[in-house]
């Protein structure tokens, strides 16, 4: 893609030993901006594909297993910020859906719980037969539940965040006839996916 070509050219330029520190710093800022644009582009493309119903291949999935698999991938990052993660599997949440969309749904909620958490905080995940709830520590005020699932909405601006993660999760849930809701309870931000 043109963005990948630009990124590669920029990376090659950054390897030039004749660059001054100031020039290298400016190139690094440009590289960060390009990374953000690439991430934004991927998210918008995914939303468009979801909206156009382009994910037709489905299969029976056990969301518990997918969740545990991706939790392992994030383990090191959570440890770095000293965020304690617990998962309470009360039952198995089975669903028939596209596996890529299931992964996007779960990873967006995991990323959200991490990005909007505090150092030394926690993430508690509860899985039942009909729901998965992500609870995380974070800012001590509820978020605007009227706008939280809107595209580009950001309750608290985080560097590198596109403001599309929860909009993607919401679109996937609507496509799969699941519901997603946000609530604030006992100083925890809670996102619950459930069957309609």
Report each predicted region and the residues it spans:
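Conserved micro-motifs of the catalytic ATP-binding
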Residues: 52-57, 94-98
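Short helix-loop "hinge" at the ATP-lid/N-box region of the Bergerat-fold HATPase_c
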Residues: 112-114
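Short conserved segment of the HATPase_c
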Residues: 140-152
